């Protein structure tokens, strides 16, 4: 005869293992409206499919697809420490689409990867809202992503981000640096702050020197200045490309001016940067002062106030500045290109880019 006494159900569930499927579903429901605001006419279908479909925009004769992926580095650690999650998504989009822009590409769509130890729906929704804002600023569609709850891989609600962007450019209009020549003028376009690079050093300085994040610089707190989202240059620069023959562009990210300008210079070309042409924003002055950081170390770690550099013919320099400034981008002549027989491919960054 069987024992009729009921026993509690001791079977384990996915939730017991630390993965909350309902939380993931709740997040998807909350971000559908965000994705909808970013849609483009070329996008076929909405969120939720196994793959996102997108047509090539009309008007291209020989379209070339351009792809890129990036993250936001340890700026994410600062965001977690400050409990500020509303702008880090914009940083993620900016890092990807500004890279596509360098070759003249129009961003089409964006996908994100969000990995965490324990999914906090409110935090994740804030992050994705920032991603949506970034996509709107860049004119690209948020077509999907992946949210991975991985207990044991990340501490608590800590999370990591990665972004993936795809754009398109007319083959005959690809900007690859091949037109760069001696005498070209370099136009600097202002950054909004440290963008998303150099934050390991930035955080080290703040920590070692016990810097007060509430102190005011440039009319706002240091915390606000450090978390200012990366500027998205897509729309102003694409407009510039319609009006001016752009020879090359460099997105000033990790490696700063000396690390990124050589990536778009032809062999034998040397960039001469006029240090007196701009004043560093207060954030970088503070970091150099508090950390005792050498000048060249600053230049190869931070953008130092320059988020993008554009090379144009000297005859187009003034028009380039005029077009960019008219669209709200602060820009100026930052230097020029000269020939240098010693500047061979793969040469030391101090040779390829000199500061005068």
Curated annotation (Swiss-Prot):
Pathway involvement of the protein, from the record: Purine metabolism; IMP biosynthesis via de novo pathway; 5-amino-1-(5-phospho-D-ribosyl)imidazole from N(2)-formyl-N(1)-(5-phospho-D-ribosyl)glycinamide: step 2/2
Gene Ontology cellular-component terms for this entry are: cytosol
The Gene Ontology terms for molecular function here are:
ATP binding; phosphoribosylamine-glycine ligase activity; phosphoribosylformylglycinamidine cyclo-ligase activity
Which reactions are catalysed by this chain? 2-formamido-N(1)-(5-O-phospho-beta-D-ribosyl)acetamidine + ATP = 5-amino-1-(5-phospho-beta-D-ribosyl)imidazole + ADP + phosphate + H(+)
Highest taxon, organism lineage: Bacteria
List the keywords (alphabetical). ATP-binding, Cytoplasm, Ligase, Nucleotide-binding, Purine biosynthesis
Instruction: Give the Enzyme Commission number.
Output: 6.3.3.1
One Pfam family this sequence matches: AIRS
Q: Name one GO biological process term.
A: 'de novo' IMP biosynthetic process
Compartments in which it is found: Cytoplasm
Which PANTHER family does this UniProt record tie to the protein? TRIFUNCTIONAL PURINE BIOSYNTHETIC PROTEIN ADENOSINE-3, TRIFUNCTIONAL PURINE BIOSYNTHETIC PROTEIN ADENOSINE-3-RELATED
The similarity comment for this entry is: Belongs to the AIR synthase family.
Q: What is this protein called?
A: Phosphoribosylformylglycinamidine cyclo-ligase
């Amino acid at each position: 005869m069987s024992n009729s006494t009921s026993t509690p159900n001791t079977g384990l569930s996915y939730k017991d293992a630390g993965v909350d499927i309902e939380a993931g579903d709740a997040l998807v429901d909350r971000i559908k409206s965000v994705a909808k605001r970013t849609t483009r006419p070329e996008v076929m279908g909405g969120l939720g499919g196994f793959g996102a479909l997108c047509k090539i925009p009309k008007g291209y004769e020989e379209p070339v697809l351009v792809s890129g992926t990036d993250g936001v580095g340890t700026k994410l650690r600062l965001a977690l420490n400050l409990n500020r999650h509303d702008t880090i998504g914009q940083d993620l989009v900016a890092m990807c689409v500004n890279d596509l822009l360098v070759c003249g590409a129009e961003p089409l769509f964006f996908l994100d990867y969000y990995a965490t130890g324990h999914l906090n729906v409110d935090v994740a929704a804030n992050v994705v809202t920032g991603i949506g804002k970034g996509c709107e600023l860049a004119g690209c569609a948020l077509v999907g992503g992946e949210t991975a709850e991985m207990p044991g891989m990340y501490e608590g609600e800590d999370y990591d981000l990665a972004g993936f962007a795809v754009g398109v450019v007319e083959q005959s209009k690809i900007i690859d640096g091949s037109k760069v020549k001696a005498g070209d003028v370099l136009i600097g376009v202002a950054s909004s702050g440290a963008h998303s690079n150099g934050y390991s050093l930035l955080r080290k300085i703040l920590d070692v020197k016990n810097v007060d994040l509430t102190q005011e610089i440039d009319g706002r707190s240091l915390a606000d200045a450090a978390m200012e989202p990366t500027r998205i240059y897509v729309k102003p620069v694409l407009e510039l490309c319609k009006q001016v023959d752009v020879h090359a562009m460099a997105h000033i990210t990790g490696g700063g001016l000396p690390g990124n300008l050589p990536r778009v210079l032809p062999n034998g070309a040397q960039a001469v940067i006029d240090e007196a042409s701009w004043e560093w924003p207060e954030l970088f002055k503070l970091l150099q002062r508090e950390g005792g950081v050498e000048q060249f170390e600053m230049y190869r770690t931070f953008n130092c106030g320059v988020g993008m550099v554009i090379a144009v013919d000297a005859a187009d320099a003034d028009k380039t500045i005029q077009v960019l400034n008219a669209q709200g981008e602060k820009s100026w002549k930052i230097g020029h290109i000269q020939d240098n027989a010693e500047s061979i491919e793969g040469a030391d960054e101090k040779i390829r880019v000199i500061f005068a």
